[in-house]
A protein has these predicted regions:
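Beta-rich accessory regions
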Residues: 1-161
Length: 161
């Protein structure tokens, strides 16, 4: 049941269970509620890399404390794979996010329709993923337990930044 599911999370052994999300600012844009990370997060960025990706791109990572900001997407077919734990796909106005389940085979997934994908901002740490789509029009928070595979794979039909 639910108790067994909650207690199966890897962080239970470390003495904690639930997630504390990053601070965010709420605002109204075009009559819709949006969310974005607070500006103060920009001040704590370290080791910033700007990468232009086209076709298949692999980004090697030393840690799972990551912020990825992809812009200039122009609604193309695109996918992001974070260590085979979190996968994000966009194609034909469909955004699909898959998160590897920590104690069963397979992935949990959420799917939403969006008219276009302009940008995506992803924050990761050892056990949490936060995804901001189109300047916070859609926002997702997941428990995601990353393993030793620390690479990010990006596949796109056009150049993204």
């Amino acid at each position: 049941g639910e108790l067994e599911y909650q207690m199966s999370q890897p962080t239970v052994e470390e003495g904690w269970l639930h997630a504390l999300t990053i601070p965010r600012e709420l605002f109204i844009q075009n009559g819709k509620l949006h969310q974005r990370p607070v500006k103060e997060f920009e001040r704590i960025r370290r080791h910033e890399r700007v990468i232009e990706a086209e076709g298949y791109t692999f980004i090697d990572q030393e840690t799972w404390s990551v912020e990825l900001l992809a812009e200039q997407l122009s609604s193309q077919k695109i996918s992001f794979n974070f260590g085979n734990v979190l996968k994000i796909y966009f194609d034909n106005n469909n955004l699909l996010i898959q998160r590897k389940h920590w104690n069963m085979k397979g992935y949990d997934e959420v799917q939403v329709e969006i008219s276009e994908l302009e940008n995506i901002q992803v924050f990761l740490d050892q056990s949490t993923a936060e995804i901001f789509v189109n300047n916070g029009e859609k926002v997702f928070t997941f428990k995601a337990f990353f393993t030793d595979e620390k690479g990010i794979e990006i596949e796109s039909e056009q150049t993204i930044l």
